[in-house]
Amino acid sequence: MPERRLAADFSIPRCARCAQRTLSREYNRLHEHKTRILRDSEEKPSLLSMWEDFSLRMAHIGAQIIRYRAYYCRKLLKAAAAVYADIAPHEVLSGVYKTVSSVTDPFADARTIEKQLIDHVFSHKTAEIAAKSCLSGPHKDDLELLLDGRSASSFGSQGQVRTCTLSLKLAERELFFDEDGEYPVLLLDDVLSELDRRRQDFVLNRISAGQVMITCCEDGISEKLRAGAVFHIQNGEKSAETH
């Protein structure tokens, strides 16, 4: 399993979500613009005069994003570990938020993180110009999942990896409910086929509340979904619904 690439707008508390989305939109805009500057600088070297300004602005916003993510990931991993323990009590799920290597403490104040980002990007200016791309920043953040202290992507079975992913999904959903008082719509695409019956039953019981859409390819599993509407799709055509 590849590391879980971090989405820019986590399901963090509502006010923080609004601020995070605003920051993420601005960061993405700056990132796209700076990428164009680097890409086109070979034909128009004068564009590089803007490199410093965009790098400083990205560092300022990126520091705030990193700090948001660090706090949210800590909360998410704690909740996900509890979910995973209910599914597989003999294994321990943990994780590491991976951001720019120069950031020594993602929980530090934003000014400290910003300075570390600035130092990092300026030390890589020549490399960025040669690569024609932005080489570091929160756009490359990851969440590495660990099982019993070892990388799930490298050492976990398919079932373990799928259970890790489900644990994160269910934890995000529960954190959202704790904050907003309602569950978000949950979409699960063929996630049950690689789980044994005990884990299938656990997942289905865990998602009994709220709106959920599940796809599956096995009739045996679909029988367990009779609490909701079930319909079949074959050759792009949807059959009559059953309950």
Predicted features by range, described:
Residues 189-191:
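Walker B catalytic acidic pair
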Residues 38-45:
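Secondary-structure edge/capping motif, primarily at the C-terminal ends of alpha-helices
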Residues 46-185, 194-198, 202-205, 219-226, ...:
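Conserved NTPase motor "head" modules and their coupling/switch loops across ABC/AAA+ ATPases, GTPases
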Residues 1-38:
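Extended, charged alpha-helical "arm/stalk" segments used for dimerization and assembly
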Residues 161, 210-211:
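DNA-recognition element of transcription regulators
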Residues 212, 230-232:
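Conserved beta-strand scaffold positions in the cores of enzyme catalytic domains, especially
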Residues 211-218:
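Structural recognition of the conserved hydrophobic beta-strand(s) that form the central parallel beta-sheet
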